[in-house]
C-alpha cells in the first residue's frame, strides 16, 4: 500500500517546525515515517537551500531553483518512500513556493502552476497542515532567535502577502488543508493535531 504524504506550512515564526517530530512519533506507531524539508532533503537540495536562503538572485531564478530542488527531492526521497509504503512528512512543499515566490515576491501564479505540473506530475500531499499566526506573533517569535536568512529579513508587507496567499490556497483546497491556529499553546495545538492525524 502506498504511503501518505503530509506537509507542514506557514510563514516564518508560525511555529510549525516545533510539531513535526512530535507528529512523526505519533505516526510511527502505524508506519515507517520519513521526515524531510524544503528546500533541501537531498545533498543537492541542501546545497541549493544555502544559495536560496543567503544569495541575492533574480526572482525567476529563485523560483526555478526551488523547483529544481523539489524535483530532486521528489525523485530521490519522496516518491521512493511513498512507493515503499512509508509516510513522508515534509517541512514545506509547493504551497510555500506559491506563498513566498507568488504571494510575497509577486511572481505570476500561472507560471508557478506550470512548473508545478511539470516537476510534480500530479503529486500532491494527502494532508497539508497550515500553521497560521498574525504577523505580530511571528515577528515576536523570530526576534533575536538567530541571524535571519534572506526570507526572514523581508518586510512586513512581504509576509502579509505570503500569509494571504497561504490562506487563499487553503480556502481553494479545503479537502487537503487543515488550518491550525498557531497562536494557541503547544499543548492546545497538539490536541488539535492529535484529532487530525486520528482521521488519516
From Swiss-Prot:
A GO cellular-component term linked to this record: cytosol
Lineage, broadest ranks: Bacteria, Pseudomonadati, Pseudomonadota, Betaproteobacteria, Burkholderiales
Keywords attached to this entry: ATP-binding, Kinase, Nucleotide biosynthesis, Nucleotide-binding, Transferase
GO molecular-function term, one example from the UniProt record: ATP binding
Organism: Cupriavidus metallidurans (strain ATCC 43123 / DSM 2839 / NBRC 102507 / CH34) (Ralstonia metallidurans)
Function, as annotated: Phosphorylation of dTMP to form dTDP in both de novo and salvage pathways of dTTP synthesis.
InterPro entries per record: P-loop_NTPase, Thymidylate_kin-like_dom, Thymidylate_kinase
Keyword Hydrolase listed: no
Gene Ontology biological process terms, A to Z: dTDP biosynthetic process; dTTP biosynthetic process; dUDP biosynthetic process
Record-linked Pfam families: Thymidylate_kin
Protein name per its UniProtKB record: Thymidylate kinase
Enzyme class: transferase
Name of the encoding gene: tmk
Coiled-coil blocks: none
Amino acid at each position: 500500500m502506498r504511503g501518505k504524504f503530509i506537509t507542514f506550512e506557514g510563514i516564518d515564526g508560525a511555529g510549525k517546525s516545533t510539531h513535526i517530530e512530535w507528529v512523526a512519533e505519533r505516526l510511527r506507531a502505524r508506519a515507517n515515517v520519513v521526515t524531510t524539508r524544503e528546500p533541501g532533503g537531498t545533498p543537492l537540495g541542501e546545497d541549493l537551500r544555502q544559495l536560496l536562503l543567503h544569495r541575492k538572485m533574480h526572482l525567476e531564478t529563485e523560483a526555478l531553483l526551488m523547483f529544481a530542488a523539489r524535483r530532486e527531492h521528489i525523485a530521490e526521497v519522496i516518491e521512493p518512500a511513498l512507493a515503499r509504503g512509508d509516510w513522508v512528512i515534509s517541512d514545506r512543499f509547493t504551497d510555500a513556493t506559491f506563498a513566498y515566490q507568488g504571494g510575497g515576491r509577486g511572481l505570476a501564479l500561472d507560471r508557478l502552476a506550470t512548473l508545478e505540473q511539470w516537476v510534480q506530475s500530479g503529486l500532491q500531499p494527502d494532508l497539508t497542515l497550515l500553521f497560521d499566526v498574525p504577523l505580530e506573533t511571528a515577528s515576536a517569535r523570530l526576534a533575536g532567535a538567530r541571524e535571519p536568512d534572506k526570507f526572514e529579513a523581508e518586510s512586513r508587507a512581504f509576509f502579509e502577502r505570503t500569509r494571504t496567499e497561504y490562506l487563499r490556497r487553503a480556502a481553494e483546497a479545503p479537502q487537503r488543508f487543515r488550518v491550525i491556529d498557531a497562536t494557541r499553546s503547544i499543548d492546545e495545538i497538539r490536541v488539535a493535531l492529535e484529532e487530525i492525524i486520528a482521521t488519516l
